[in-house]
Amino acid sequence: MKKVLIILMAALLLVGCGNTSDKKVNTDEKVETDQKVSTDENVKYEKYSSTMTGAFDTVIQSTVFEKDEETAREYLNYIEDRYMELHKKFDSFNNYDGIVNVKTINDNAGEKPVKVDDEIFDLIEFSLNAGENYSHKTNILVGPLTELWTKYRDAYAYDEQLTMPSEEEMKAKEAEVTAMFGSPIPTEEEISKILHDISISVIELDPQNKTVFLKPKGMKLDVGSVAKGYASEMIKRELEEKGVTAALISAGGNIVSAGDVTKVREPGNQFYTIGVESPDGENFEKFDGIVAKLKITNESVVTSGDYQRFFEAEGKRYCHIIDPDTGYPANYWRSVTVVVNDSGLADFLSTALFVMSPSEVEEFMNAHKDVKALFVTDDGNIQLWGDMNDMVIGD
């Protein structure tokens, strides 16, 4: 499941940091970038950035702070190559030549266990353990449900439009989809049949042999609710092991900070500023695109929302985030932003909390005081939980 964008604020990317300057490097022709050479002799660290697409079906913006371009280029190339490598391994819906990935596990459901590498096995084990320790509302066994709802969302094809279609166009599309599938949305019968098989008992993990087996034929893993954050956390730790001075990565709605920001920002301003994107609709026009600005140092931030992948039918919005209990898309919140230290956990929790009702959220947040969260409701209100208020800049 994809996340919505968290916007890196212009103040972070473009305003000088006291002892840094700004450069962009072209990392192996992967993106078009320009280069601005600093003439400040007092510069200690310079800022280098790159942008890539393709991995995890999102735009990934990377910024590193280093003293020389060669070192920065090595880190930026590493980030891009590593994201693409992990994207292929963690992909639940596509095969790649010579790669055993999550899709390989799905292809062999009901037939045989699949031997996977440590990174895939650890991702699946992490996801299942988080389900036991935090919430079952994020469930990587919802692959058949994801596939079912994606079939309808693709038929409506709203993702490819820059603006919402007119009411007449929506009615025409709804009639077209109904003629195609017999219903404007998945039927209760289709959903109930799938829900019957969504249980922890349908998956077998063998830690010794590193095999994964889905017992029912047709069962599918969908690790999209965790994979991007998990991959981001892996890359963050690897960058720190390699000795990166400071780095900030925005992978769609996943923000991770690596290294030590205090080395590259002047005293009194030793944090990054990020903006949480506003949902669509008239209730959010007052926010001018951003519902909140947050300051972070080494935390991970992930947002889940309903306003980038959805379709509308019979006057109701159906987003891409599925409640594993009901089989239907969740609609309690417009977006949920979670801040914790681990990006994989932040990814997991942002999905789980998005699916929870207000009363379930209250119970969860009261039981997990270390989790910071920001909830946006359909009427344009913002709710802060944990110590999130300490991270918000301004009103």
Please annotate each region the language model reported.
Residues 4-8, 15-395:
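Mature catalytic core of soluble alpha/beta enzymes
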